[in-house]
From Swiss-Prot:
Pfam families: B12-binding (PF02310), DUF4070 (PF13282), Radical_SAM (PF04055). InterPro entries: Cobalamin-bd, DUF4070, Elp3/MiaA/NifB-like_rSAM, HpnP-like, rSAM, rSAM_horseshoe, Tetrapyrrole_Bchl_Biosynth_MTs. Signal peptide: none annotated. This is Uncharacterized methyltransferase sll1242. Binds 1 [4Fe-4S] cluster. The cluster is coordinated with 3 cysteines and an exchangeable S-adenosyl-L-methionine. It comes from Synechocystis sp. (strain ATCC 27184 / PCC 6803 / Kazusa). [4Fe-4S] cluster binds at C177, C181, C184. Residues 163-394 form the Radical SAM core domain. Its EC number is 2.1.1.-. Its cofactor is [4Fe-4S] cluster. Keywords: 4Fe-4S, Iron, Iron-sulfur, Metal-binding, Methyltransferase, S-adenosyl-L-methionine, Transferase. Coiled coil: none annotated. GO terms for biological process: methylation. The keyword Iron-sulfur applies.
Amino acid sequence: MRALLIYPLFPPTFWSYEKILELVGRKVLLPPLGLITVAGILPQEWEFKLVDRNVRNVTEAEWDWAEVVIISGMIVQRDDMVENIKEAKAHGKLVAVGGPFATSVPDEVQNAGADFLILDEGEITLPLFVEALERGETAGIIRAQEKPDVTTTPIPRYDLLELDAYDSMSVQFSRGCPFQCEFCDIIVLYGRKPRTKEPAQLLRELDYLYELGWRRSVFMVDDNFIGNKRNVKLLLKELKVWQEEHQYPFRFNTEASVDLADDQELMDLMVECYFDAVFLGIETPDEESLEFTKKFQNTRNSLADSVDKIIKAGLRPMAGFIIGFDGEKQGAGDRIVRFAEQTAIPTTTFAMLQALPNTALWHRLKRENRLLDESKGNINQTTLMNFIPTRPLEDIANEYVEAFWELYDPHGYLDRNYRCFLKLGAPKCKTAFKLPNLVDLKALAIVIWRQGVKRDTRFRFWHHAFGILRHNPAVFEHYITLCAHNEHFLQYREIVRQEIGEQLRDYLSRQQQDKVEETVLSPTAIAAETEKVLAS
């Protein structure tokens, strides 16, 4: 069987990092780990070709070659996924679709023309798909009620990737999260009991990446890397030895809950394994909103103190913030900005709350008749809320745009970055010395020219750079990399302001039109007009 695997386009997002990737001559931040895992699960006598549409388009030769087309993606990739399903059908191909989007909204995928829907987790459903093909079936919906044992998951087919196109590779140690955040779809898709691989299993994946010549960053894509602290510590103890033996070829980052700060041993192990950054779902500094959305793990200790501990341990924080929670008070955007400034978090992803399909939030809003469009929850930073909030949407949208704009003001960003790296714990591992390549030197020269010469940030840029060299030189390379990141954020805040502004104007226009129509067609208005006619 000749299988063509297609990964749909992402729209421009906070994480697309176009301007940063341009600097270093790469096209995409991360590879499609789900699809290359699918390729590892399917029969290895099959032939595979993979096209990441974020890297390049599918060629006619590839369409002609394929016997079956397999597409997977997330909700944010909806539009291009639907287009590729239609394109595959136009080429007369059998189309199978899976992944988070198809699992969450199967009707949309089926309506687009998919033949097979391979839903839930592939370790169980992909073998059932293969059996269906062997029986001669040409369509079907394949689901699984149980969660698979991920210790049986094969090594992803990293060899199918165009490795030079990616800035970082992805590996996964665990699935699931023990918490119960109302808005989160991870616990819906993967459950609340974290399932982990064996340490030796993950090390084999790293061995394979190493054999393929990979020597850059690796992102642990676990939704909560520390969901099972016991097992993750077992992994880190073995990973530390592996990294030492291989002279630390990989720099790691990941996602974790804020209670990471409560476990010094765990943070130390991560830093000793060459983890240097962690994404934290902080969401909001408003404790009432955290409790309402059931993010109780963020209310047990001071969030500011937790972030400070994580920084001092040697892990740069990236933080996720959300605006628009039920019961939220005016000024939430300002409070988020103040918190980011207070805690010196350089990179803060920020979005208006969305009700993602089948989450607890989605079900509650559906019961309350507050969903504006049941199927179109999104996770992009340029999308208005898809439900009726408890305070005016225009207030939330305006606060959001203003806060996003302020967070990525070039002066404020450099200051926040500087304060973070002044106290960032130094790396605890000795990496092999290597000369910078020409691409990296060119990128550095561009950043210095833009931020240290051309723009009015020049004084701050040089003051802060020399300050880091003087007070914390071990983190200087990491610091300069984060300075470069604002090349993307400067552009993206313009996109946020423009697209949210356009959507808000359309929304307010529709609201006004609805009011006019309601007034014109209301029984009171009709009765009044009738009386006028009779009186005349």
